[in-house]
């Protein structure tokens, strides 16, 4: 006879206690007066503080009505008389909703309601009035918090049933006991705690709850007796001991844009700040950390009265600005200068409004951190760095430290904290115990940090979190805890700690690798505008030195728009479609504004501080050649550093006999090349070095099925190569243009839904091979890459970081190397032997696949969540294949990459000082207009000395003067900033 499993039908002790706990919570609300006079008006938010109303009139809102629309705003008014029975009592507004609501009562901001809290305290702010008038503004997002979870649809759906609004009073005895039991039940249910203590808690909670007769008038007396029993028997017990030391830091992560547009973040931020300020009124021990200068700036602009209240709490030390940066940016894709400006404009705001320089960087949710960050932070007045995802989201390896020292690409060091548990918790005992057990630096790092507060869409700390925290000292089995601010934790545990471990390298996140590629157009425009604003600042500065006005405010406005759109859910592509459209609109505005600042000149200006000598395409209607559909000609500009010259079409054209084409083969002064019909290169013999560069696939376009699952826009899985989508040759490779400078071959490939045109150009006077791509992309769950298997024996690939390069292993000896199958790079990667190698230089791509001898440049993705239209449409981009002798540094790959990415600008300006030896990263006027600020970065890993014809100020990146000198010794990969008095 088969064994039949017996299903347990009786309740476990903790389940029986939990059931009665639910009964107890019904009695928290004492008096409950329905508010009947409620009206609502629906709207669509169109800017940060402007709305388009669907109707001119308010309509009645009654219990049972559907209200709110997806991605919709609603304005709600309500009015109620306060009966004599409720006067002189502590009154609350009770409203259970899935929306996010800001509440004013009798003209005063009293708090916020959202899915994490359902009531707002009124009495301290409105006194004891006869009548209360409510004005509420609510927002309802376009999707549920978690569409994977069917239960979340009912709680946080886009359309919801109005369950009524009430004026209520709270039974403080019930509420207090609820918090006691909630705290203890969390321990009883968690296997992280001592089993004997959990049994003790369950037994004694049962005894306490047995004192309450829920169905009789003696219930209030029983509740008081149960409260006393819990205190005297459970909380007083010290027979069980815990261990650990955990700092509790309150914060709220606020995504500027994600499943909502940036314009909605203004109200999300107001609601979050209001809630914390109101909690501070009631909990004198409460300290709260809040990041992103942009959120403070928007609060000051749109809600100045709340900002003034916030400033008072900042002065008290209870509301703590953290983060240093303007927003929480992605830390892989932005340029070094963009990351500097994030700190510069962030610190500028904090200094001007709070009189302080923030000494920490607070980036809990970013998708990995570039190796260039420590130097930037250190030179922006930041000593401490906080992130989180490496310890909680890695898919393969556990990041080995939580409190440590992070050493940057140039040797700069900052203290770093990567807390062992998620940055969104609700401060329950089990979460704190989990944090301590996961903490890896118990012997060297001091306390561990546990962040608490709801986040992503803001919200922050709740009354429940603070009440539970007040009970921690009564529970002997828990780690020791102390509530403190973020800066206090960092300074107490990290500053001067000589026992801390050191991490020297990038902080790579083993997840979200797809964000290097998703939303390709945003990444292309971001890079183009990063360089265009560099040009605009340099040109404007040189003009200002000749007496012209400097457009400082316009440049600042443009920079801030760029910085906002580098937020870690905008530039990486992990957002809904309206966010994408907002970013495009910002980029169009910035592009147009910068064009107006730059103007137009007869000559071409070389903003690079080295001679431009790479063959370049110049647009000209009379030209005989084309590039990206524009007519023009190819020539070597030979423009001196920071100088300008008129470029004209050469009078003499070379014969086209330099390129011998025979079917799918071509011979140039540099190479003998063999092509496949799809544009792949099957042979590339370098005549200069007498060596073959191809050893397998080379310039092969491949499209893969790309189904990472839940985190569609975010992730690429290691098995993406399992299924290759067949590419048909729509139009085989053929010669299309041949001139005295360039020879072009065109091939068109396709899938059932997409068309991909590749134009391969080879040149008479340059060894570069350019591949232009024009794509009409209509795929779903696909990843396009171009693959290279060079005939090079190297166990590492050099990858540009934007301010130096990083060497990454190509082998898979360890799980750490295997997990880095897709990494972020900037303008180029290079794989070389000591006497030569291959560089691939791009104009807008960031993802690089690394698999032993095969390297791949990620070109396009096609994801559906959270944006079903992601990347659909037309794309144009190019990359260079650049074989060379010697190393990447010997071959000046950085210079070639800068020339490829920074087009010549028409402007009649020049500069005598060319700052040889380092890359001119930025030139601008200081904020006070007193100095010309010049930023230079060493890109090739070499030491050097720079001498100046006059004394200059050495500055930090915040433009503070450090000292005067006429020469500077610089280290490999160092960024220096100098100030030249006007």
Where in the sequence are the language-model features?
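Alpha-helical scaffold elements lining the catalytic groove of polysaccharide deacetylases
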Residues: 331-352, 420-440, 722
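Active-site and substrate-binding clefts of carbohydrate-active enzymes
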Residues: 127-217, 221, 245, 253-254, ...
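Catalytic alpha-helical scaffold of carbohydrate-active enzymes acting on polysaccharides/glycoconjugates
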Residues: 230-248, 268-283, 298-357, 369-379, ...
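Fold-level signature of zinc-dependent metallopeptidase catalytic domains
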Residues: 255, 259-273
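Aromatic-lined ligand-binding clefts that engage carbohydrates, nucleic acids, or primary amines
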Residues: 87-105, 134, 605
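C-terminal (or distal) subdomains of carbohydrate-active enzymes
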Residues: 373-378, 388-392, 400-403, 437, ...
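Short beta-strands within extracellular/lumenal beta-sheet-rich domains
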Residues: 66-84
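Accessory carbohydrate-binding/adhesion or oligomerization-edge regions at the termini
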Residues: 1-60
